[in-house]
UniProtKB/Swiss-Prot annotation:
Name assigned to this protein: Eukaryotic translation initiation factor 3 subunit D
The gene coding this protein: Eif3d
Disordered: annotated span: 523-548
Functional note: mRNA cap-binding component of the eukaryotic translation initiation factor 3 (eIF-3) complex, a complex required for several steps in the initiation of protein synthesis of a specialized repertoire of mRNAs. The eIF-3 complex associates with the 40S ribosome and facilitates the recruitment of eIF-1, eIF-1A, eIF-2:GTP:methionyl-tRNAi and eIF-5 to form the 43S pre-initiation complex (43S PIC). The eIF-3 complex stimulates mRNA recruitment to the 43S PIC and scanning of the mRNA for AUG recognition.
Main location per the UniProt record: cytoplasm
Family from the record: Belongs to the eIF-3 subunit D family.
Modified residues (Phosphoserine): S161, S528, S529
Assembly and binders: Component of the eukaryotic translation initiation factor 3 (eIF-3) complex, which is composed of 13 subunits: EIF3A, EIF3B, EIF3C, EIF3D, EIF3E, EIF3F, EIF3G, EIF3H, EIF3I, EIF3J, EIF3K, EIF3L and EIF3M. The eIF-3 complex appears to include 3 stable modules: module A is composed of EIF3A, EIF3B, EIF3G and EIF3I; module B is composed of EIF3F, EIF3H, and EIF3M; and module C is composed of EIF3C, EIF3D, EIF3E, EIF3K and EIF3L. EIF3C of module C binds EIF3B of module A and EIF3H of module B, thereby linking the three modules. EIF3J is a labile subunit that binds to the eIF-3 complex via EIF3B.
GO molecular function: mRNA cap binding; RNA binding; translation initiation factor activity
Region entry RNA gate, spans: 285-299
Sequence positions bearing N6-acetyllysine: K53
Amino acid sequence: MAKFMTPVIQDNPSGWGPCAVPEQFRDMPYQPFSKGDRLGKVADWTGATYQDKRYTNKYSSQFGGGSQYAYFHEEDETSFQLVDTARTQKTAYQRNRMRFAQRNLRRDKDRRNMVQFNLQTLPKSAKQKERERIRLQKKFQKQFGVRQKWDQKSQKPRDSSVEVRSDWEVKEEMDFPQLMKMRYLEVSEPQDIECCGALEYYDKAFDRITTRSEKPLRSIKRIFHTVTTTDDPVIRKLAKTQGNVFATDAILATLMSCTRSVYSWDIVVQRVGSKLFFDKRDNSDFDLLTVSETANEPPQDEGNSFNSPRNLAMEATYINHNFSQQCLRMGRERYNFPNPNPFVEDDMDKNEIASVAYRYRRWKLGDDIDLIVRCEHDGVMTGANGEVSFINIKTLNEWDSRHCNGVDWRQKLDSQRGAVIATELKNNSYKLARWTCCALLAGSEYLKLGYVSRYHVKDSSRHVILGTQQFKPNEFASQINLSVENAWGILRCVIDICMKLEEGKYLILKDPNKQVIRVYSLPDGTFSSEEDEEDEEEEEEEEEEEET
């Protein structure tokens, strides 16, 4: 017969649970656990982390804290992968940057301590002399910019406008400090030889445009002729009977204001008998307008970025062409010069030709130089009494006010226009000097400047007109510190150097990274159309070889 067996009850007078571990469970490891815990968690995010160690174990739970029941996967070679842990190489200007900075700071501190120690040991008169020497040294460094800035960004070397070949010989070298000292006063009054073309009248409604009444810039499809000197039929005709130096206003303005230039440029010089012709290369970037060229930190974007120097130059040229035509009364009455435009064919529509007039002028530079220049006007303007004034129309464009220490035109143009023009003079000194020289050579009464900005900072295809400003070329030249005597002195110096050369073709090249211009002698056939075709064929062959 079954009977009830009373179990053994362990009495624990001091707490709960059994008093001792049974024999069968004595050597078995134990870990506090919860039925809600997963076995072998990849990462345990349940444990709270406390910054203060006083609360590390006070509110934490022991459940899930051990790894006795965790599942570990055995080594599986199929899931093995190589990981590239090589350190990326730093660029040259970043390498040891902080170490050099600390070294420079430590050196400056030691130098100051040494100066202070020397001052303490010197007598009173010697102290005054030492302080005066230090003051003059700081003044010199401030004036001439001999200050070492360890955090200053390194400027990358700029490319030359044309590749200098090994068979080119340097005939002359002129540095900018030398050219800035040139002066020439024996310049005769200009004489008009021939005037060609037709001009449209300026629309004075553009003078009333403000930042609050901005006007969109329209794309106007008109033909602009940028004919070089030797391709000009009028200059060819005049060269048979008069003159011994021939050029265009853009080429002469480049030479006359060259001491302000930063980027590389080049001009072809042809010595034919006793005559001198200044030309530009075909398919060159000579006519592109630079942007922020003379800024402390000019744009340095590369590739297809719309803020790269070349794309900014193309954008500025596009804006300048469109604004110079949009601000005129297009399709209405024109001011006609005695002779027609020499570059327009008979079957071309006159409305498709840009408003431009050419004035061929003659200067006497001493007794031996007879200079003939083709100058340009962009428009004509009538005064209060009906008098006619010829004007040159140019455009300043804002691409991003956050760069080159710029100011926001939409905020400052109406109230602080002086600050805007001062900033532009600092960032585009060379371009403004070229425009001023062109206006002075052409004899224009006024120089019209348009202020055009992007519709959006990151959109280089749409622009708006924010305002205009008018200057007299002579007054503007003095305002931007452009010395006319120095400009003529530089030109006379270049002409004298080229006149001493033998017959042939030469190249005036601005060094891309130095304040120097050099005169190279070129072999026969350089920059000819046949040579350009051969270069293009070689480039195509190289591209085909790379593709294959």
